[in-house]
Amino acid sequence: MSEPVRVAFLVEQCWHTVPGGTAVAAVGLAAALADLPGVSVTGIAARHARPPAVGPTPPVPVAHSRLPRPALYEAWHRTGRPRVENIGDHPGADGGLSLVHASGGAVPATRLPLVATIHDLGWRHEPGHSTRRGRRLFEAWLEDARRAAHVTCPSQATRADLLVAGFEPDRVSFIPLGSDPVGVDPSASAALRSHYGIDGPFVLWVGTTEPRKNLVRLVSAMEQIPDVPLVLVGPTGWKEDAARVTAPLGERVRVVGRVDEATKHAWYAAADVFAMPSLLEGFGLPVLEAMGHATPVVTSAGTATAEVVGDAGLTVDPTDADAIAGAITGLLADPDEAARLGRTGRDRSTTMTWSAAATATADVYRQVLAT
């Protein structure tokens, strides 16, 4: 029988001001890892007096550093301290930790074997889609990840970028993210439609409002589709004001903002089409989540989201508003085809679960510990 694997797993993303998909991914993977036999997970985070205000709650016990996030991230990068083994009250205090998993973003300091997850290298493709400070931070984290024994990434697109960046192929594993089925009472979706005054077909978008999400072109596409509302669900990120971007649609747009998980899934179940024509994603969890509700998807060709949807949705050039409009219009005009794609998407979504991601990740842990 193999030795149990005791993992220190970064969950600081849950406390970020805009937690985003990396926090959802960290929580989903940590929970599924903790459910595996022979694996125990302790979260690692900066100093916090309270649980996350807006992000998901870590599903595992958390050891907190004495340092606040900015100081902790800076210390890890510049001084290699404090080591994870010396943070808080966890098995590492008595030498019980097996390895450390940097689950996205900052890379903790440690002398233990290290696994790092890198979601994307988007700032290298589109520097203008990140702040100058953000680009410096992302580059620092990428350099810190080079000391990892192994790197995981959620898409073949990101893996290709990592190889171009100089990571060795045999040290980089593609492990898709996951999404587990979420039941929605039809009355919850009906209540959302009623509350927002939607009595016909509508298009849904979910994400953080920022330039790479390409809302400008989605709005341009929707201008070509009269009488169909566009619903935007998710928090404000940076450099893009949803109200300004969507102004051309007038009363046809519903800017919902940040919602809880149950409400988000009720929106997925209510939508007639889910559109996410991002210019770049590391994976695109909202696409997978929409597929899980049998909602037909329109997303971007040549990107990680196209990998997620496969042949279970429509992919278009994200820089072509006419193509985006054509795909959405086609689905709204052909309910049978929309339903077929929805069913195909739901079936495909069952192959990408957090359990599957955790099993593949645990295999990486054991591979690292065996070398």
Where are these regions (language model features)?
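Carbohydrate transferase catalytic cores enriched for Leloir-type hexosyltransferases
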Residues: 1-371
